[in-house]
């Protein structure tokens, strides 16, 4: 199996950033998320370099929904990242991490009045998803005596090769305004009291392993930019979204890079802007491709069982990594304490949750396994802990961050006390 360079095998043990995964499991316990900060920064810098070499005004926003840990966001903020945020919670975390308000875009298809008020108060840009939202935020900004910079989210009506639940640019998607209706939306925005329409925004989907769909999205956005410029809209930024995928099947999936993306998309974008006579900032919103392969989930085998097939029952389930259950997603797995042992058996790796679908890795070629072995689930940094839950009243696990040779918790593990912390006893039960 191909491994990214921050993952190595030494003395039969899997290592991440030079740290022995078995030793980490012993020190911090399992289940345990382990993240390489250096890998996240490396991936971010690859976007900055590839895009910046081809277009002079680029802003890379981290899609905070992929992994909202403050430590990761601080590391990215230190390198100049902004963020695409989808809630007041993500907005507050991005600001606390040190991200500049002007580098934040508040996205979302169903923002609350308090979301809009917070966006205006903090001075961030807002991607509007409907005309209702336009008039709501105009009223909020007017009441506050402020102007708010906005874009509209464009639905480009593009078919993309990905799971239907994460294809966000389809004509039937809940996201955005149909691309043919965008000029009318901007006409309405131009006459609002407190609205400054300065951008356009799209996002076509996630885990896309081809560059061509992004080229088609850029073509749609260039056409819209031309129409808006002719209407008198002064575009300060055009956000092409994120969605570049990663090779979850390490040996067979294509692995388009930021360089591949830039080489195909930037010529289309740059030529379009030159034809319009404008030089807006280009914004992109990578999430998965920044953080997914930075992280592994370490989980210990509680027991093995032979029934109609062989099972390895581990202490992490879809409470901590729901992607396999939700999307039938594939994650490579390695036995961290037997990382170079012969793959002479087949197991289905299952979690502890009371659901038949709690399967992390079905029918995998693995070494002979026993209780106590440590399995590493790879590429768990995007939509892993971010989508974790306390289902079955299981406290969520800790997260560890590695920077160079330093290792530290970036989130403590929860306890039973945390499960009860927000619960109240009604007065009639006292």
What are these model-predicted stretches?
Residues 1-149, 187, 192-196, 230-233, ...:
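A charged N-terminal "starter" segment
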Residues 2-3, 157-302, 392-394, 403:
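Active-site loop/helix belt of alpha/beta enzymes
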Residues 20, 36-39, 43, 47, ...:
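General structural feature for long, well-ordered alpha-helical segments within catalytic domains
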Residues 63, 149-155, 201-203, 239-241, ...:
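Short beta-strand segments
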Residues 66-68, 89, 110-112, 130-132, ...:
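Active-site-proximal loop/turn and secondary-structure-junction residues that shape catalytic pockets
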Residues 73, 96-97, 116-121, 137-140, ...:
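Short acidic, glycine/serine/threonine-rich loops at helix termini
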Residues 116, 138-142, 174, 188, ...:
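A generic local secondary-structure boundary/capping motif
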Residues 264, 270-273, 277-430:
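Charged (often Lys/Glu-rich) extended helix/loop segments that serve as interaction or gating elements
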């Amino acid at each position: 199996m191909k491994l990214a360079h921050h993952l190595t095998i030494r003395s039969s043990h899997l290592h991440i950033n030079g740290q022995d995964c078995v030793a980490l499991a012993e020190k911090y316990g399992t289940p345990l998320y382990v993240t390489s900060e250096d890998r996240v920064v490396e991936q971010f810098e690859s976007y900055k370099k590839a895009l910046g070499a081809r277009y002079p005004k680029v802003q890379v926003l981290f899609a905070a929904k992929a992994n909202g840990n403050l430590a990761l966001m601080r590391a990215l903020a230190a390198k100049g990242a902004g963020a695409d945020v989808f809630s007041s919670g993500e907005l507050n975390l991005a600001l606390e991490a040190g991200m500049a308000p002007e580098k934040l875009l508040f996205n979302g298809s169903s923002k609350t009045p308090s979301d809009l008020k917070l966006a205006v108060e903090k001075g961030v840009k807002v991607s509007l998803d409907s005309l209702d939202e336009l008039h709501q935020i105009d009223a909020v900004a007017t009441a506050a005596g402020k102007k708010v910079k906005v874009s509209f989210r464009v639905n480009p009506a593009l078919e993309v090769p990905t799971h239907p639940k994460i294809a966000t640019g389809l004509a039937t998607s809940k996201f955005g305004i149909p691309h043919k209706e965008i000029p009318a939306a901007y006409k309405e925005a131009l006459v609002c009291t407190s609205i400054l329409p300065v951008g356009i925004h799209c996002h076509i989907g996630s885990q896309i392993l081809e560059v061509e769909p992004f080229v088609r999205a850029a073509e749609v956005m260039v056409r819209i930019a031309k129409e808006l410029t002719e209407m008198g809209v002064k575009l300060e930024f055009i956000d092409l979204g994120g969605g570049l995928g990663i090779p979850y099947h390490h040996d067979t999936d294509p692995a388009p890079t930021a360089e591949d993306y830039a080489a195909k998309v930037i010529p289309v974008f740059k030529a379009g802007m030159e034809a319009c006579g404008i030089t807006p900032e280009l914004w992109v919103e990578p999430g998965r491709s920044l953080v997914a392969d930075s992280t592994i989930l370490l989980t210990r085998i509680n027991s093995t069982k032979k029934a109609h097939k062989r099972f390895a029952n581990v202490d992490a389930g879809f409470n901590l990594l729901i992607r396999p259950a939700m999307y039938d997603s594939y994650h490579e797995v390695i036995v961290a304490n037997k990382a170079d042992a012969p793959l002479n058996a087949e197991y289905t790796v299952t979690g502890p949750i009371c659901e038949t679908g709690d399967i992390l890795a079905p029918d995998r070629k693995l070494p002979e396994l026993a209780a106590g072995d440590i399995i590493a689930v790879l590429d768990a940094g995007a939509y892993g802990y971010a989508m974790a839950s306390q289902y079955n009243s299981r406290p969520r696990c800790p997260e560890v961050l590695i920077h160079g040779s330093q290792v530290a918790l970036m989130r403590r593990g929860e306890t039973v006390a945390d499960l009860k912390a927000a619960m109240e006893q009604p007065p009639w039960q006292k």
